[in-house]
C-alpha cells in the first residue's frame, strides 16, 4: 500500500456542479460533448467519464484512438469522437468499436472507406469533418471545403456524422481576439452551409470550446465541447469572476519535517533562498516529478492550517520547502494544500498557480504525475 502522503483528491460533487453550470450556459437543445482527453485533464478519465455518463452527457471527445479505446474498455457506451483523427492502420479498430473520428484529408477518407468495406460489420465509418477556420493546426482549410466535400462523395462507406472547427483565441476578450473569433465563426458557418448545399446532413455541428460557451452565441451549432470548465478552471484570466465553477482537483501532502534556521542559511539547490532572519522551514514530500512546477521556485504558495506559506528555495524532484515562520501552530503531520480548495476555506486555484509558474491552467492540471501521485475520489 502506498503510504506516501502526497495525493490528489478528485471531488465528483464539484464535477457535477460544473456540469450543471455548463448545461445552463448552452442554448436549449444543445448537447454536450465532454472533452476527457489527457486522462480527463489529469483527473482520471474512467471515474470522470462514468460520472458524466450518469449525468446524461451526450458524447465524449478524446485526442487519439488509444484514449477512445480506453473509454470503450471501461464500459462507456456514449458516442466517442477522436478530435485529432486516426493514424494509418487504426481504421478497423476505430470502426469496430463504433468510435467516430475527425477527418481532414482524402487519404484518410480512402483508408476508412476501404476498412469499412472490408470488415463487413454493416456499419459505415462515422466521420466529423474538421475545418481549419484559423487555428492553423488540423483541418481542411475553410476555402477548400467546397471542393473537399464534392470529392468526399465518392466514398460510399463513410457517414458525415458531424462538422466542426476550433477557435484559436476565444479565451482572449480583447478587441483583436473577439474580432478573430467572430471571423472564425463566420467561416465555420459558411462551411456548414456549404455542406448542406451539397446534400450532407451532419447530425452534429460544433465549434464552442469552454471559452466560447461562456462568450459566444452560436445558434447554428447543436453541440458544445466543454473541457477545462468541467474541471473547475477557467480558460484564461479574462474570465475571472464570470462563472461560479468549483475546482475538482486538490493536490495535498503533509509536513514531513520542521526546523529553525538562522539568518544567512541557504535552502535547496543553487542557494536561491537565503533566510533574511531566523525562519521556520517545513519540508514537504512533493516535487517536479509529481507535476509541481519547478518554476514555482521562490514563487509558489501552499496552505497549512488555513494560512499561506511561500515556497523557500528551488523546487526539487521530490521535495519542496516552505517558510512557515508565520503559520501559527504548525506541526509535523499537518496537511498541506498545494493546489485546489483547502478545508479551511482558501484555495490555490489552477489560475493562480499557472500565473506564478508562467504557464496556463491546462498545463497545471494535466501535469500532475498520477503515476506517482495516488488519486482519491470523493463525493
UniProtKB/Swiss-Prot annotation:
A GO CC term assigned to this protein in UniProt: cytosol
Modified residues (N6-(pyridoxal phosphate)lysine): 37
NCBIfam families attached to this UniProt entry: alr (TIGR00492)
Keyword Nucleotidyltransferase: no
Gene: alr
Pfam families: Ala_racemase_C, Ala_racemase_N
InterPro entries on file: Ala_racemase, Ala_racemase/Decarboxylase_C, Ala_racemase_C, Ala_racemase_N, Ala_racemase_pyridoxalP-BS, PLP-binding_barrel
GO MF entries: alanine racemase activity; pyridoxal phosphate binding
Family listed: Belongs to the alanine racemase family.
EC code: 5.1.1.1
Annotated catalysed reactions: L-alanine = D-alanine
GO BP: any one term: D-alanine biosynthetic process
Active-site residues, as the UniProt record annotates them: 37, 269
Keywords, comma-separated and alphabetical: Isomerase, Pyridoxal phosphate
The protein, known as: Alanine racemase
Free-text function comment from the UniProt entry: Catalyzes the interconversion of L-alanine and D-alanine. May also act on other amino acids.
Record: residues binding substrate: 137, 317
Pathway annotation: Amino-acid biosynthesis; D-alanine biosynthesis; D-alanine from L-alanine: step 1/1
HAMAP family reported for this sequence: Ala_racemase
Cofactor: pyridoxal 5'-phosphate
